[in-house]
Every structure is written in structure tokens, then in C-alpha cells.
Amino acid sequence: LLLLIRIFEFAVMSKTILVTGGAGYVGSVLIPKLIDYNYNVKCLDRFFFGREFLSQQKFKGNLELINDDIRWANSKIFEGVDIVLDLAALSNDPVGDLDSQKTFEINHKGRNRIARLSKENGVGRYVLASSASIYGQQDNVANENSSVKPLTTYSKANHNAEIDNLLLDDDNFTVTALRFSSIYGVSPRMRFDTAVNKMVLDLFSKREISVSGKENKRPFIFIKDAVKAYLTIINAPKDKINGQIFNVGSDDQNFTMGDLANEIVHSIDESCKINIQGTNDHRSYFASFEKIKTILGFTTDYGIKNGSIEIYQALVDGTISDNIKTKTVEWYKY
């Protein structure tokens, strides 16, 4: 048994993972966890939002930082890489709409380039970070076989990347696309331009939450559970994930925006006010997460209640704070 454990530890330690966009909101939580599990990590990023949180002494020897762009990075970055987690992207709808051409260049063409180069350079496994936003507007709960209705540049680019990258899978190259719910939670590269994070910030700073489109539907997932999903895919048998798309989230975190605000207020401070506003946002969908649960046994550990409390406590403690870098579209404009 001890011999088997040592063989397993060696196998894990010998694996190298390239994370594109590794200094982003999710990547900066994911990479320390990968290092905790003894993976060697290469982080490819433009570092628009800084790199301090990935330059800590404890990461030395297990982490290589590569300041480059997925659109033209040299193929040498794939040397010795076993797995690619492709998170690099202009990261939401408002940012995507700032420059539609650049969004397609990066989120579609750039990530397809990374997938093709991964295959050409002998990488065994490639994971695309996609988004459930490609469902757009749905009357029924959307599963992986539902028709997609991407309504924005960001979601259209994600859909294009899925189509092109999944065509590359074969017996030697495992390709998986993960359609993530809207992610919330604390990160070293903090964002307050996502629904839950923004609501908690408003509650903390203004003691009221503004809700645009209270009937609009969305699925949500805590950032630590998003990281857990990547670890699940990394370790899954390839016959269960090759050429597959998985929605990532939990059925109990499908919320209308109005119900989401109520859940956050009830979790943190019931005396806070909720202001309902109109919206021109036509995105509205719930998603099913039965596939990832049934095939891979993936379940989430966090919900809106304990997740929003963690964000609020971090604001109280001062470990996170609001600044221009936490509003992605404002930082790019700046």
C-alpha cells in the first residue's frame, strides 16, 4: 500500500499544468490549490491586474510565470506540459462589448490556437473554461443538449471556441468544455462586477442592494467549487470526459435576481434594503447540473448563504476592498 501511495505521489508530482489566464479571478485561486496538490504549474497571463499574489516565496520552484498572450505566445510554453486549463479570456459581457473584434480574437481564435498547439505539442488533456451564459434566454432548465442562444459577443465567442476546440479530441488528446455558472467569492484578483459579489459589496458599503431585472434567472457557483470542478476534471478518466461538455454548478443555486438579493440579505443583515430597478438585459436561464453529478460525482460544498457571508467577512476584515481593478470593464477603460 505504501508503495502504491508513493507511486501515486510521484505521478502527481511529475505532472505539469499550464494555466492560461492564471492571474485572473479564478486562476489566482486555482493555482495555489494545484500547487497544494503537488502539481508543477506554468501560468500564462498578461498580468493586467498584477502578479503580486502569485509571486509569493511559497510558490517558488512549483510555479513559472509567463508574461505573454495566448494569441502569439511561443509554442515552447508547452514543453513538458501534461494538462492545459484554458482560462484566458476577456471575462464578461460588458468587457466583451468594449471591443467585439478583440473579444473574438482572444476568446475564440486565441483559445483555439492554444488548443491546437496543445495537441501538436503532445499535451494529453485540454480543458476549456466556457460559460453557461451561452444559453442566453431559456424557458426550460437548460442541459448540455439544449439549444444555445448566445446573445452577447462574450457568449458567442465562447460558443465558437467550444465548437472548434471539441473537434480536436481524439484518443491521444482529451478535450472538455466546462460551462460555468456565474462565479462568486473571494479571490486575490477580486472582482465586484459579478452579481453576488456586487450585491454583497453594496450591502456592506451602502446597506442596500440594487437589483436590475428581478425576474431574470441565473445559475451561480462559489469560486472554491469552481476550483473543485477543475480538480475533478483533471483527475477524471478520459473516457468519461473526452469530447464532453459539462454545466458546472448546482441545481439549488438557480436563482432569479430578486430571490438572490433576498437570500443575501437574509444571510447577512435582514435590515438592509432592496431596490428593484428595470433592465434591458435579456439573458435569463436556469441550468441543470445532473450530468456532472451523475458522470463525475461532482457536487458543490458552498451555497449563496455561506459564500456571501465569506465575502462580507473579508470586506469587514479588510482582506478585500473595492477599487478600480475590481471592476474589470472600468480597469480596461482606464
Label every model-predicted segment.
Residues I70-I106:
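NAD(P)H-binding glycine-rich loop region in Rossmannoid oxidoreductase-like domains
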